[in-house]
From Swiss-Prot:
This is Tail assembly protein GT. Interacts (via C-terminus) with tail tube protein. Interacts (via N-terminus) with the tail assembly protein G and the tape measure protein. GO terms for biological process: viral tail assembly; viral translational frameshifting. Belongs to the lambda-like tail assembly protein family. It is found in: Host cytoplasm. It comes from Escherichia phage lambda (Bacteriophage lambda). The lineage of its organism: Viruses, Duplodnaviria, Heunggongvirae, Uroviricota, Caudoviricetes. The keyword Magnesium does not apply.
Amino acid sequence: MFLKTESFEHNGVTVTLSELSALQRIEHLALMKRQAEQAESDSNRKFTVEDAIRTGAFLVAMSLWHNHPQKTQMPSMNEAVKQIEQEVLTTWPTEAISHAENVVYRLSGMYEFVVNNAPEQTEDAGPAEPVSAGKVFDGELSFALKLAREMGRPDWRAMLAGMSSTEYADWHRFYSTHYFHDVLLDMHFSGLTYTVLSLFFSDPDMHPLDFSLLNRREADEEPEDDVLMQKAAGLAGGVRFGPDGNEVIPASPDVADMTEDDVMLMTVSEGIAGGVRYG
């Protein structure tokens, strides 16, 4: 994984800021969601300047972690980030935290968050409902799980840890602009194919999804016993059941003394064009 980096200088001190990984991007959204939930649960609590500074320090600490000595000294990334966050809060001025936070946002492509399944606003619609941090986090996490499933990666956290934030955003953009567009095209052409073929083949079991390349219909379940009995009522020879499934219909006199194999051969040969044909 190659992360974008940029030197950040403040008051003569230079550090290296890195683009966040996709996993860090999700963890940052999780922090914002927790803060929003705490604010909703306590009507008297508001998002203060202290919260903004701590959120910025957390974001900067995650960025510094990629090139910080604590990365190899601490057993886990979360513990190392906590140590770096305390270092930022105690040694950095608030102005530097704010500027560095903006750099990390820019490097990671996190100025705009995409929410899955966001309803389109029409001209007659009222003011758009504000997108909460919880909705953004849920949308991003849902997409991350879908992406892991598409890539065959059962551990979605490991997948995101090895992916940059901009790479994750590129996948998000690709699926939003191409994959879902392909789904709409597939629906259109499968429906068109179904309409055309239904004019020539009056098959009640035919379905538009039979012609879909992206969403194949699952195999039909085994027919029930009564359906099998109804189909068996039309067989010539062998054990034959009536439509009610109870009464056994005896074989016709002309084939009563013949074996089952002979009767089956006669049945099949009725449709042969040319050669020996039986009535």
